[in-house]
Amino acid sequence: MQVTDGCTLVIDTSYGSTVGVVGHEPIVETDSRTHVEKLQVNIARAMDAAGLGPADIGCIVVGVGPAPFTGLRAGLVTAKALAFATGARLIGQNILDPQDAMLRAALRGDAVIADAAGFLADVSHTAQNGQADGRPEPEHHITLCVNDARRKQLYFSLNHEAGVTGSETDSCHWIAMDIDYPGHIVERVNAEVRRRAEIGGMRYIVDVVGHGAARYADAWQSLDALGSVVEGSILDAGAAGLAMFAEMALKHADDEAPVEPLYLRRPDAEVPSPLKHVLNHAGAQRAD
C-alpha cells in the first residue's frame, strides 16, 4: 500500500452524500434532493472542522457506486476537480465491498465499529449450529451487500470472506455487482449458495446489509438461511466507518486504473433500432 502524505478526504454520493476527513466525524446528507447542492459547502466545512486547508489534502477517496446517475456523477466530478487543483492522489472505491467488511467486523465483535454504528446493535456474533448427531456443523456467514437503485430495484453483490473456500486468492464475490429486483436477487442468491454448499459441505448464513435492506425485508424471508438484515452503510458509522472505507480503498488501490462511476443500469435513452426492410422496396425513386 502506497503511503500518502497529507490528510485523506472522503467524498461519496452513492446514497445522499458523505464528506469527511479521516480521523474526524463526517458530514452526512440523506436528502437526495439537496445533497448535490451542498457538496462543495460540506467539503469546506469538513476541512475547516479538521483545521486543514486544500493544500493539506494528500489523498481523495471517492465513492464510485454503484448508484443512480445524477448524484454519483456529481461526486466524481467534484473529486476529480479537487484532485486536479490540489495535486492529491485520487482513488475510487465501490460502496458494496466495504459493507461486507463492516458486517464482518460486527460479527467478530469489533467494539470500535459496533459502538460507532448503532444500526449494528442487533447483529449477533458468529456462532456454530449443531448437527443431528451433536457435532458442530461448519458454518460461515456471507454478505448480500445492497444499495438502493430506486425503481423497486437494488444494486447488489454476494460477498464472502476470501479464503473461506480454501484459497486465499479466491474472489470475494460469489455474485459480482449487478442490479435486479429483490425477488430475483433472492432466487440468484439461493441458487449460488446451494451450489457452494454442495461443493464445500458447509452451511452458509446470508446477512443482508445496505441502504434498501429494510425496505425489502419481506423478500429476504425467502432466503434459505437468513441472518441479520441491516439498514445502513459503512459511511453511516461515523469516523470509524469513514476510516474503514478509506483504509479499504488504500489497501486495494490501483493508481493505473481509471476512477469511473459504476452505474450498472442501462441508460433510458437508447439508439433506436433500424427501420425494417420492406421486401422488394428500394425506397422512393425520383422520377426523371
Segments (PLM) and residue ranges:
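Acyltransferase
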Residues: 214, 228-288
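Short glycine/threonine-rich catalytic loop with a Thr-x-Gly-x-Asp
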Residues: 32-36, 70, 233-240
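Phosphate-handling active-site elements
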Residues: 51-55, 83-94, 111-112, 254
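Surface "functional belts" at beta-alpha junctions
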Residues: 28, 89-236, 268, 283-286
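N-terminal beta-alpha supersecondary unit
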Residues: 1-66
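DPxDG-like acidic metal-binding loop motif
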Residues: 59-95
